[in-house]
Swiss-Prot record:
Its cofactor is (R)-lipoate. GO terms for molecular function: dihydrolipoyllysine-residue acetyltransferase activity. The pyruvate dehydrogenase complex catalyzes the overall conversion of pyruvate to acetyl-CoA and CO(2). It contains multiple copies of three enzymatic components: pyruvate dehydrogenase (E1), dihydrolipoamide acetyltransferase (E2) and lipoamide dehydrogenase (E3). Residues 2-78 form the Lipoyl-binding domain. This is Dihydrolipoyllysine-residue acetyltransferase component of pyruvate dehydrogenase complex. Its EC number is 2.3.1.12. It comes from Rickettsia typhi (strain ATCC VR-144 / Wilmington). SUPFAM superfamilies: CoA-dependent acyltransferases, Peripheral subunit-binding domain of 2-oxo acid dehydrogenase complex, Single hybrid motif.
Length: 404
């Protein structure tokens, strides 16, 4: 009897996914445990292994298919002696997804076309211009949507009409561009961050940290290792450990919002934002407060490599109670990050730069790092956030406290 290959559920919350690539073709022999396809989830690309032996008789869902429902039939394995007629009859009886996918895709494209038309009409109805500018435009037969306004908030004023000529009109439709389809990861990022910004009452607190002592200790530790970069401790490793220690001291910052209650977590699991080719992923350091700097650094390097290779497993990126996003390596001084819901906090880390500061009534040069905490005001108040940042600053400026 033919054997079903179903779209797997690679996480508890997964409802559908993209079938990114088939690694086997029709007619190939398949053994148990052999990787046959790659599935793109909301966070990573996962390998799918066959649990049975047979011949890949028919691929139902082609590669690069999007939004394939979990547990839908994606392919069929055949056993020895089964005919093409047997396979076709089996598919006809068991497959109801292929047609629905095509229908959904057609409807989606139609809806997108309608939406695009509506957006254009909506935009044209909201052209702001002064009454005099409108009269002049009508007299001169000038379309207001072709005029770039120079007034407040882009308002078209008299001078814009007087100085307008068709040669100055700017139309982006004539530009050359390349169109990159939004993959599943990018769509999920867009959806989650939009929901976070629209539904979570963000507030922001910033603090400056002197990292001179931290840099000295890091240099001393790294000198004891070989020249292999894989063994070196990074500044970000210290930041993760400092956050873990601060959350241990201020447990009320290690929380998330639920409709029925605020959840305070016993474990200190820290998500760390990692840039990948298709967007961003947040692998998790579990029980970060219980690990020393060497263990934490080693684990983080493994997670970063797996993230960039799209090899993270769901348990390695789902969950977490607090997120760190570090853009300091790009020279960014400070920034306000968007909360990674349902978490209640994300800390944006900026670059460390030499600055003049006052210490003991003397002006000295110190290496200062800016950090900005974005917090969910439903969960955490300003006092708790300030207490957390003060604790974090203490660990960063006195790094020996993290190592004992």
């Amino acid at each position: 009897m033919p054997i079903k290959i179903l779209m797997p559920a690679l996480s508890p919350t997964m409802k559908d996914g993209n079938l990114a690539r088939w690694l086997k073709k029709e007619g190939d022999k398949v053994n148990p445990g052999e990787v046959i396809a790659e599935i793109e989830t909301d966070k990573a690309t996962m390998e799918v292994e066959s649990v049975d032996e047979g011949i890949l008789a028919k691929i139902i869902i082609p590669q690069n298919s999007q939004n394939v429902p979990v547990n839908s039939l994606i392919a069929v394995l055949s056993e020895e002696g089964e005919s093409t007629a047997d396979i076709d009859a089996f598919i006809a009886k068991n497959n109801s997804v292929s047609l629905s996918l095509k229908t959904d895709t057609t409807l989606k494209k139609a809806n997108e076309s309608i939406t695009n038309v509506e957006v254009v009409k909506h935009d044209l109805s909201k052209i702001f211009a002064s009454p005099l500018a409108k009269r002049l435009a009508k007299i001169r037969n000038i379309r207001l949507e072709s005029v770039q306004g120079s007034g407040p908030h882009g308002r078209i004023v008299k001078q814009d009409i007087l100085s307008y000529s068709p040669s100055t009109a700017y139309n982006r439709d004539t530009e050359e561009y390349r169109s990159v389809p939004n993959n599943n990861i990018r769509q999920i990022i867009a959806k989650r961050l939009l929901e976070s910004k629209q539904t979570v009452p963000h507030f922001y607190l910033s603090i400056e940290c002197n990292v001179d002592k931290l840099l000295d200790i890091r240099e001393d530790i790294n000198k004891s290792f070989s020249e292999d970069k894989l063994t070196k401790i990074s500044v970000n490793d210290f930041i993760i450990l400092a956050v873990a220690k601060a959350l241990q001291e201020v447990p009320n910052a290690n929380a998330s919002w639920a409709e029925d209650a605020i959840r305070y977590y016993n474990n200190v699991d820290i998500s760390v934002a990692v840039a990948i080719e298709n967007g961003i992923v947040t692998p998790i350091i579990k029980d970060a407060n219980k690990k020393n700097i060497i263990e934490l650094s080693h684990e983080m390097k493994i997670l970063i490599k797996k993230a960039k290779d799209n090899k993270l497993t769901p348990v390695e990126f789902q969950g977490g109670g607090f997120t760190i996003s570090n853009l300091g390596m790009y020279g960014i001084k400070n920034f306000n990050a968007i909360i990674n819901t349902p978490q209640s906090c994300i800390m944006g880390v900026g670059a460390s730069t030499k600055r003049a500061i006052v210490k003991n009534d003397q002006i000295i040069i110190a290496t200062i790092m800016d950090v900005t905490l974005s917090a969910d005001h439903r969960v955490i108040d300003g006092a708790v956030s300030a207490e957390f940042l003060a604790s974090f600053k203490r660990f960063i400026e006195h790094p020996v406290l993290m190592l004992i």
